[in-house]
Amino acid sequence: MGTDGDRAKAVDLAISQIERQFGKGSIMRLGAKERIEDIAVIPTGALSLDIALGIGGVPRGRIIEIFGPESGGKTTLALHIIAEAQKRNGLAAFIDAEHALDVSYARKIGVNTDDLLISQPDTGEQALEIAETLVRSGALDILVVDSVAALVPKAEIEGEMGDAQMGLQARLMSQALRKLTGSISKSNTTVIFINQLRMKIGVFFGNPETTTGGNALKFYASMRLDIRKSGSIKSGQDVIGMRTKVKVVKNKVAPPFRETEFDILFGEGISKAGDILDLAAESGIVEKSGAWYSYGGERIGQGRDNTRNFLKEHPDILVRIEEQVRSEHGLKPRLQEQEEPAK
């Protein structure tokens, strides 16, 4: 072996060769802080998650998988990403294979439902054909499929209730993703698959949880987000929301395995004010002394809930704090980000 300098040069040369051949972000140092500047993103609606993803949101022209237990916030997060894309004049589509989209809740989150393309397909094949046609059009910015578990193959629907249909859904997903992946990259469309968890039978060691639809989606996804409830948010005796934990279990464009937590309030979605308050307190932008929170030398609230409500009622202060948090974490200012075109 050569000297440390020779080895470092050899590694740098190998990295540059890999990046030329396979693209920027195909290899990186795990502790690297730098953002991959040329990756266009759509914010998630939760600033802490944008930071955890390493690039300020979900990347365009990639496949994303959001999975977790029931009522964990999967669809809520996907709807927030749609709302953020629409704020940037993006066109969004929602393939509702579960036939369960709550339109009034989507509106409360900020989705422009009048411009949202929606499809409620009868079979898995139909859902994925519609997805491919929309992606190939090149006009779409974001497509959400809710959910992989509800993409039932035609043969299973037409068969008898007790028929064994082994591996049909996995084969369907594998074939569809092979066709979709090239179109997604060319059209710069972000495709989000929402997925459910199942328990593997007979697993005594390791994690018994697995996602539906076989292994293809695990391989094709550039990001995989594990989202689940970590606690309840109460106002007196009433439960008004839930604390949600997201773990980035796969990330091809930034270092993976980062985690974050934020509040989801019922009927409102992700609490932007609560999320920014937590980040600001963590980095010292908002000072916390006992139960009191202070900003710019002035007290803004006693207790987290009161301070969160104060920030909701004073959006000008919230925007100032958000810009400081974004600057602290190397993200673009929000105004500059919103001025950029959708495509």
Swiss-Prot record:
Source taxonomy: Bacteria, Pseudomonadati, Thermodesulfobacteriota, Syntrophia, Syntrophales
Record's subcellular location: Cytoplasm
Protein name per Swiss-Prot or TrEMBL: Protein RecA
Organism (species): Syntrophus aciditrophicus (strain SB)
One GO biological process term: DNA recombination
Pfam family, one: RecA
Origin: domain of life: Bacteria
InterPro entries assigned to the protein according to its UniProt record, in alphabetical order: AAA+_ATPase, DNA_recomb/repair_RecA, DNA_recomb/repair_RecA_CS, P-loop_NTPase, RecA-like_C, RecA-like_N, RecA_ATP-bd, RecA_C_sf
SUPFAM superfamilies: P-loop containing nucleoside triphosphate hydrolases, RecA protein, C-terminal domain
GO MF annotation list: ATP binding; ATP hydrolysis activity; ATP-dependent DNA damage sensor activity; damaged DNA binding; single-stranded DNA binding
